């Protein structure tokens, strides 16, 4: 677990950047941290890049760092004089990458699969400037779900509705997730999808 001082946070505030992301949760997380930034969608085909990387047989755990870099670079090319931040998160369960559910039926199946078991959440972040990557990081956390029955899963999904589909793990730890989570080992913000503390530490060292 990484700890961060008030001084580092204060130095990070006011450093402007562009978040290369369509993720509402990452946007909300960084806004809640008091950071100054704008948002731009990545100009890249994430699924195509992911497929190519996996064909090259890269270590699955490094996938978020690679995808974060591609997202940041795609926006940096159009904004070469600004800091651009990209990020990506994956779940690995039983050595396989778990993709986002597209329907509530798929979400139900996924929660049933994860029930009572551990899985790894790996987030990567990349900062680019002048079309070049100047910083990157990868963090891993382990999440364990409670043993949940089919009835509990149905009740949970009824409460969350389709908004749960925006969460890779289908539990949204920042909302109703604690109802079905047993434990989190590692950085909490990493589970939310962004390695916040290391990023704040980096940002505090950037000259305005």
Region spans (language model):
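Generic enzyme active-site microenvironment
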Residues: 86
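N-terminal polybasic phosphate/anion-binding patch
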Residues: 6-83, 96, 151, 155, ...
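Anionic-ligand binding region
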Residues: 124-125, 132
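Short beta-strand-to-turn element immediately C-terminal to the catalytic PLP-Schiff-base lysine
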Residues: 92, 128, 183
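GST superfamily/GST-like fold recognition
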Residues: 12-35, 107, 117, 140-208
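Acidic low-complexity segments
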Residues: 132-140
């Amino acid at each position: 677990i990484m700890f961060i001082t008030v001084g580092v946070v204060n130095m990070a505030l006011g450093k402007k950047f562009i978040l290369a992301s369509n993720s509402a949760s990452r946007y909300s997380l960084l806004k809640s941290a008091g950071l100054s930034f704008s948002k731009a969608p990545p100009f890249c085909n994430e699924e195509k890049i992911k497929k190519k990387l996996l064909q090259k047989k890269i270590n699955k755990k490094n996938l978020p760092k690679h995808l974060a870099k591609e997202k940041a670079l795609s926006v940096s090319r159009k904004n070469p004089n600004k800091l651009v931040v990209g990020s990506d998160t994956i779940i690995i369960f039983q050595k396989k990458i778990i993709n986002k559910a597209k329907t509530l039926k798929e979400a139900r199946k996924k929660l049933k699969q994860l029930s009572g078991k551990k899985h790894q959440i790996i987030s990567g972040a990349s900062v680019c400037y002048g079309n070049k990557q100047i910083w990157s990081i990868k963090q891993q956390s382990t999440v364990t779900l409670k043993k949940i029955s089919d009835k509990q899963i149905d009740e949970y999904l009824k409460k969350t509705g389709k908004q749960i589909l925006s969460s890779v793990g289908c539990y949204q730890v920042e909302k109703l997730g604690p109802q079905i989570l047993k434990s989190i080992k590692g950085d909490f913000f990493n589970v939310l999808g962004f390695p916040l503390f290391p990023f704040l530490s980096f940002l505090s060292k950037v000259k305005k």
